[in-house]
Amino acid sequence: LHALQHRGQEAAGITSFDGKEFHTHRAMGHVAGNFDREDIIRALPGSIAAGHVRYSTTGETSLRNVQPLYADLATGGFAVAHNGNISNAVHLRRELVQRGSIFQSTSDTEVIIHLVATSAQKSLLDRLIDALKQVEGAYSLICLTPEGMIACRDPLGIRPLVMGRLGETIIF
């Protein structure tokens, strides 16, 4: 996250999964200030994690918009970190609210969570595919689930999404 600090200076967050439960730390400010204490790092156990630095393009600058965002869905835990702009987020949000969704943030990222949660598909992967078919714009995102990590990007590949390897570790 330190290497990505230049992409967002408002806030930073990390969500990890330890095989049983998700753990999240999100805070306003820089990565160095938010993750400089050993107790914070120890509170994020697991073999899989997603981090995010925030630069607001949609939604107010507040803690409730700091990513990764997390929700307990019918299919299990679901965390998402998103880079980009969902151009039809206002329209989708309005439809979701009319159908009973209750939003906790003003971030367009939360629209993805609600689309996944309300999808009629059975599996989480099929729900995510169904959700992203409704989304317009330029984006890349990382989703954490109890089964692992899912990486997605917009159909035109406008937003960067890079995968690499560091030893035995895969990094996006």
Give residue ranges: language-model regions:
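Conserved short alpha-helical segments that host acidic/polar catalytic motifs at enzyme active sites
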Residues: 1-172
